[in-house]
Amino acid sequence: MRPFPISILEVEKAHNDFHARFDATQRKYLYRIVNRKSPLTIEKGRAWQVHKNIDVDLMKECIPSIEGQHDFTTFRSAHCQSDSPIKTLDSLKISQSEENIYFGFTAKSFLHHQVRSIVGSLKLVGENSWSPNDFMNALNSKDTVSYTHLR
């Protein structure tokens, strides 16, 4: 088994010059935080473990400020190859089931490290290290240098 297995849920025939990266009409990412103190065993490498208590409702307050079209410069990697930092986040869903916190992102395209940087910022909000207003200020700052710790 590969270190990071994937599952194919659906297949459709595509034209011969179809390019998976450039012709995709939608992408979905599911990111998971396991919020507990005991170490991960089976899930190690498949989820991000956070020991501090996380307030999911506080993180959800940030959703309206990030959905839609924005300049996501703050949340892009220095190695990002995208011509523009402007992307449209179609939806962000945050849910919790016991110790698991799920982040579901849907968009046509994402910047390099955009999802992990957003989740890192939302984690700061959930831990009460940042307020939802701090999150919005980070997005609006368009400053990759000051926020490199998010990646």
Regions picked out by a protein language model, each given a short descriptive name:
Residues 109-112:
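Glycine-rich phosphate/pyrophosphate-binding beta-alpha loops
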Residues 4-106:
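Non-catalytic RNA-recognition surface used by pseudouridine synthases
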Residues 62-65, 121, 141:
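Residues within well-ordered alpha-helical secondary structure of globular protein domains
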Residues 10-15, 79, 129-143:
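Acidic/histidine-enriched alpha-helical segments
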Residues 118-130, 134:
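A hydrophobic, small-residue-rich beta->alpha segment in the mid-to-C-terminal subdomain
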Residues 148-151:
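Conserved small/polar residues in nucleotide/adenosyl-binding loops
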